[in-house]
From Swiss-Prot:
It holds the Pfam family DUF2685. InterPro entries: DUF2685 (IPR024362). It comes from the Viruses. This is Uncharacterized 6.1 kDa protein in uvsW-uvsY intergenic region.
């Protein structure tokens, strides 16, 4: 039984297939490609500061 859960599809990953990314463990193939293509998002703190400036 694997203790890693894919951050994309939320299913268990066989320990031999785990690909570690900066966002967490993913399956190789479509899940890994999806994570690689995600745009880099701003941190919550930056978003909060921008919202406060708008108000």
């Amino acid at each position: 039984m694997s203790d890693k859960i894919c951050v994309v599809c939320k299913t268990p990953i066989d320990s031999a297939l785990v690909v570690e990314t900066d966002k967490g463990p993913v399956h190789p193939g479509p899940c890994y490609n999806y994570i690689k293509e995600l745009p880099v998002s701003e941190s919550s703190e930056e978003q909060l500061n921008e919202t406060q400036l708008l108000l």
